C-alpha cells in the first residue's frame, strides 16, 4: 500500500508536541522582524500526533535504500558505514547545545576540537593549513578556486583558464565557472591517465590551475603526478586536488608531497559522516604555504600564555577571501569526523585505505570476465566497467542498474565518467565483508547472464521494489516541491 504524504495524514487539532510557557515578555513578530520578511499567510503545516510521525518515517526508511540496510557501491561517493558512536558524541550536550554566537571563552572545548581536527587533516594530506568552513565538497572546490584566484591577483597576474581532465567530476568545471574562469578540457590517454602531450599543449600563461582527482574517477592513480606538478609550477600555475577519492590514500601517500597546492576533503565520504538527505556535508580545504594568507575568515588558532592554553577565532586576516559560510562550518559533522579519527589513529586510517583497495581489487577480479574493463590497469579503491557487451542484446547499463535493486543492492554510479561508454563506476569501500562482496558479484554475474538469456527480465526491472520503473527525467523537468492541500486546489481552481 502506498504511504500517504505527511500532509495527507494531517487532522486539525492533532498535535505531537507542546511548547513550554513563555517566560519572557510577549511581542508581536511584526515588531521584531521587518514586514518584507514575514509570511503573508500561515504556513500549511501538518497536524499529526507523535506516534504517527514516527511510523510514517520508519515506513519511508524501509522503502528507501541506505547504508544501514545494504551495500551502496556508488563510485566516487565512498558510501561507507557511518559508525553509531559518531552520533553519540555529536549529541553530547556540550556540543549539541552550543550557539555559534556564544562568547569564545564559553566554547573552548568546541574550538579545541576544531583546531585539533584541522591539525590532523593537515598531517593526513601534508598541507600547511586547513579551513573547516566549507560545508560541502563542491563548496570546498569553490573555496579552493577562489583562493587560487586571489593568489594570482595578488601576484599582479590574474589568469583566465582552469584545466580540467575529461574524467573529472562535473562540479570541477562548475566551480571554475562560478569563480569566473573558462574551463579547458585535458584528455585521458589509453591507460586512463592524464595525457601529458595534451596537457603540455594546453598549458599556457593564462592557466591559473589544473584540477585533478587522484586517484582519478577511473580508480587509477595518476603515476605521473610529480611530472604534472613540475609542469604546472614551472608555468606559474597551481595544482588543485579534488579530494573525492581520498579514501584510497590515507596513511599511504599525501597530496602535499605530490605537489598539490590546494586539496578539499569530504568528511562525509572519507571520514564516515552521513550523506543522507542531501547533507549536512563538510568540505574542508587544505593549502600549501603560498595560499595560507588567503584562507577564509575567521581562522581557528591556538594561543599559549605561560601554562595556559586557549583557542580563539581570528578575524584579522586582511588578505582573506572572506567568509564562505554563515558561521564556522557544519560543526556537528566535525565532531563525527573527529570521533572517527580518534577511533582509528594513524595505523587504523592506513588500514582503511588498504582494505578499500583490497575490496575493490577483489570485486573487479570477480566481474572482469563478464563485463568489459575499458582501462585495464591496476586500480585503487574503485573501478569502472562498461556495459557495451550487454548492449548487443539491447540491455543498457541503466537496465542493469535497475535490476540490481531487485536484489537489495543500490546501483553503482552509472554513465560517469563520461569517457567510458555504458559506464558503471563501482566503489565497495572498506566497510564490506568478503561475503557481501561475493553476494554483490554473484548478482552482477546473474544479471550479465540474464542480459543474454532473458533480456526482458532486465529491461523491465525492477520487479520487487515498492515503486517500479520511474520516468528518470520527469521530476527534473517538472519541478514541484510545494505541497498544496487538495481543498485549496479546489478553491483556487
Swiss-Prot record:
CDD domains: GDC-P (cd00613)
InterPro entries associated with the record: GcvPB (IPR023012), GDC-P_C (IPR049316), GDC-P_N (IPR049315), GDC_P (IPR020581), PyrdxlP-dep_Trfase (IPR015424), PyrdxlP-dep_Trfase_major (IPR015421), PyrdxlP-dep_Trfase_small (IPR015422)
Cofactor: pyridoxal 5'-phosphate
Keywords attached to this entry: Oxidoreductase, Pyridoxal phosphate
UniProt GO cellular component terms: cytosol; glycine cleavage complex
Domain of life: Bacteria
Purpose of the protein: The glycine cleavage system catalyzes the degradation of glycine. The P protein binds the alpha-amino group of glycine through its pyridoxal phosphate cofactor; CO(2) is released and the remaining methylamine moiety is then transferred to the lipoamide cofactor of the H protein.
Subunit architecture: The glycine cleavage system is composed of four proteins: P, T, L and H. In this organism, the P 'protein' is a heterodimer of two subunits.
Listed name of the protein: Probable glycine dehydrogenase (decarboxylating) subunit 2
Annotated source species: Chloroherpeton thalassium (strain ATCC 35110 / GB-78)
The organism's taxonomic lineage, starting at the top: Bacteria, Pseudomonadati, Chlorobiota, Chlorobiia, Chlorobiales
